[in-house]
Structure formats: C-alpha cells, structure tokens
C-alpha cells in the first residue's frame, strides 16, 4: 500500500494499536477523485484539523495517509441523533477508530475494484489492530450524512445501500458468525488430522500392548473414537 504521509495537522499523538475498536467508512464527497489525489492533498494542501488513514478509489488503489498508530481527525464533531444517527456517539471516537475514505462515490456506488480494495484495507488494519471488529459509518458515530448515499437509519434507501456494502465486504453479523464457525471447524479438522491414526497403526499399538487388554482395551479404543470390532479384526489378521 502506497504511503503518502499527511501533514501533522491531520492527526494526533501516538496511540496503541490495541485501543482501536472499529473501522469507520467515509466518502470524500468529491467526484472523479483518486486515492493518490487525496493523499497528495492531505500531504501538501490541507490547512485544517481533518484527515483519514486510508483512501480507496474506483480503480482499486489504496493510499495510506495517516499511520494507524495515530488518531486521524475524522469523527470528532457531533451533528445529530435524528433518524437513527450517532448511535455510537460517546463510545467510538477519533482515538479508537481507523478511517477509510471512499473516493468518487458522491453520486454512485463503489466499484467492484473499490470494494476489493476496501476489503484489503480492512484486512491490513486488522493485522495491526486486532480489536477493530466493527465496521461502521461516519453517520453511526457523529450523525453526519457520510458516506453520503449510504447514510440513514433502517427503512431508508441509504441504509439499504450500507447493508449491501457490508454484505459485499463480508461484514454483516451473520456473515462474520458463519466465518467464525467455518474457521473453528477447519481448525478442529486440522487438529484431528494431525492427532488421529489409521486403524492399522492403532492395531499395531494394540499388539504392542499400548491399549491394555480385554474390557479396558475396548473402553479406551471406543473413548478415542475408534471402532473396537474393526481394530480387533485387524489385530487378529496381523497375528495369523
């Protein structure tokens, strides 16, 4: 990811990566801008206390503008709670969020390449900030109409657009729950494959006396998930 460091007016002092709790999505509100354009502006032209960590554009480019170890001045001004806005006001702020700005989305939805870039940015952020589990809007923190066409509470067109973006990013709660379940299952399967042995290997251990005799052997094999009769049949064949 290209890094064009913003002027120091755009961010605050060093913070811990572990303090970051959420990723906030914004839009620049500008048409035809690119991630590099925005990076250069905040590096050389910006004159106010405003900034964002990463800019993502329609071509699929990400440009980092503010180090993740610094709070960008991006969600500090309260606007309104009307229409379901600002539900995280007082909980999320500049110091515990990382901000991603979507370029050229003032009048249109993000492109497929842009969505892919945002997913990459989120993955990059979470590698450094493992507690950044939420993905929210500027609207959800401060009540600002940002990211523009995706602003609004449940039942609005903006909310529908926001839910679609979350779905495209794989960030809906049910998607994340499913991901966790799949990851857990894969981990369990990998563990089983590493620790389990073939019936023939177990039969050899039985012959070597490692599983005991009689009822004790049967109990141990069954408890370990092996079919006693199958193992015993292999043992008998080996001893012929």
Question: Which ranges hold each PLM region?
Answer:
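Active-site-adjacent loop/helix surface patches within enzyme catalytic domains
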Residues: 1-131
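Basic/polar, cationic surfaces and motifs that engage anionic cell-wall
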Residues: 3-5, 16-17, 94-99, 103-195
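Disulfide-bonded cysteine-rich modules in secreted/extracellular proteins
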Residues: 185, 193-211, 240
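Extracytoplasmic Gram-positive cell-surface binding/anchoring modules and repeats
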Residues: 207-218, 226-228
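Extracellular LysM carbohydrate-binding repeats and other cell-envelope/extracellular binding modules
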Residues: 228-240
């Amino acid at each position: 990811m290209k890094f064009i460091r913003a002027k120091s007016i755009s961010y605050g002092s060093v913070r811990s990566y572990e303090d970051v709790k959420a990723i906030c999505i914004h839009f620049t509100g500008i048409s035809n801008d690119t991630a590099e354009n925005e990076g250069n502006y905040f590096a050389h032209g910006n004159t106010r206390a405003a900034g964002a960590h990463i800019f993502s554009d329609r071509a699929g480019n990400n440009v980092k503008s503010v180090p993740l170890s610094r709070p960008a001045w991006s969600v500090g001004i309260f606007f309104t709670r009307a229409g379901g806005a600002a539900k995280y006001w007082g909980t999320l702020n500049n110091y515990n969020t990382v901000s991603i700005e979507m370029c050229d989305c003032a009048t249109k939805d993000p492109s497929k390449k842009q969505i892919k870039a945002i997913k990459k940015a989120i993955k990059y952020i979470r590698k450094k900030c493992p507690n950044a589990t939420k993905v929210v809007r500027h609207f959800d923190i401060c009540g600002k109409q940002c990211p523009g066409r995706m602003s609004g509470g449940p039942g609005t067109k903006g909310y529908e657009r926001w839910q679609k973006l979350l779905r495209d990013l794989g960030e809906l709660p049910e998607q994340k729950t499913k991901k966790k379940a799949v990851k857990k299952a894969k981990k369990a399967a990998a563990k089983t494959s590493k620790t389990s042995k073939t019936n023939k290997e177990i039969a050899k251990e039985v012959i070597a006396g490692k599983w005991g005799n009689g009822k004790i052997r049967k109990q141990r094999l069954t408890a370990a998930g092996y079919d006693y009769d199958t193992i015993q049949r292999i043992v008998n064949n080996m001893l012929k």
